[in-house]
């Protein structure tokens, strides 16, 4: 039964308070269909396996990720952006002093074709590229140069807002950033209220939290003074100025 729950589609019931009324929305996760989450095709077996199939079947002792590789020769390395590990590769290359750009349009490198948005890296050795590809399980194609237009990337200066009111989403947000090897700074109300945010940050991330928790926080008298309040109107004005100055504001859950 657990396998069916994890591998088949869950269908949330059409619950309504009254006929024709608004649907009763779920408060939390509504599905956990692993094939949809992981992009894996699953075929149910509805009858016993034949003797021939059982004879050819083998036990999988361990699951190994796809092997990474670097094909071709050159000092420029092109790789697909769709693999999660590609983001880790980008951060590692930039931290090591290499360069990474994003392709504006489809690239053709030898016999390999790369969709728009693919990464183009340089400033690293063939050995370093091989090590990255092998460790992260990504496939790179080496070439001497890429003539098509690309947009250079840089390591973003990331700030993550932390309310004094507990936020589960903040913990998950920090965890995701750490898994993908982004460096970030935790910002509390005082830092947001101090302003001049664009001087220190390129991206501000606000984890999913209700408006009152962010704007007002804990009320006076309910908690020690240093943990009272939210970003307030002055903090909101500073966020608007940050965006006007070219900063990127990510409001998760909006």
Please place each PLM-identified region on the residue numbering.
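Intrinsic-disorder/low-complexity accessory segments
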Residues: 1-254
């Amino acid at each position: 039964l657990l396998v069916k729950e994890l591998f088949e589609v869950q269908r949330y019931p059409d619950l309504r308070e009254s006929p024709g009324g608004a649907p009763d929305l779920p408060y939390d996760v509504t599905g956990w269909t692993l094939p949809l989450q992981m992009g894996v095709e699953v075929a149910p077996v509805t009858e016993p396996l034949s003797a021939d199939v059982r004879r050819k079947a083998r036990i999988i002792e361990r699951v190994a990720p796809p092997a990474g590789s670097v094909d071709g020769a050159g000092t420029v390395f092109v790789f697909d952006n769709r693999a999660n590990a590609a983001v880790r590769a980008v951060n590692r290359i930039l931290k090591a002093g290499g360069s990474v750009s994003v392709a504006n349009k489809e690239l053709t490198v030898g016999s390999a074709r790369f969709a728009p948005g693919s990464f183009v890296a340089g400033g690293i050795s063939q050995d370093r590229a091989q090590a990255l590809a092998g460790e992260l399980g990504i496939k790179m194609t080496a070439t001497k140069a890429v003539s098509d237009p690309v947009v250079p990337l840089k390591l973003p200066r990331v700030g993550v807002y932390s309310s004094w009111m507990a936020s589960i989403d903040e913990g998950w947000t920090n965890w995701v950033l750490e898994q993908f090897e982004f460096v970030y700074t935790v910002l509390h109300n005082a830092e947001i209220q101090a302003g001049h945010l664009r001087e220190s940050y390129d991206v501000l991330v606000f984890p999913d939290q209700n408006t009152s928790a962010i704007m007002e926080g804990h009320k006076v008298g309910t908690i020690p003074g240093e943990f009272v309040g939210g970003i307030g109107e002055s903090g909101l004005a500073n966020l608007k100025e940050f965006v006007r100055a070219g900063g990127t504001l990510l409001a998760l859950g909006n």
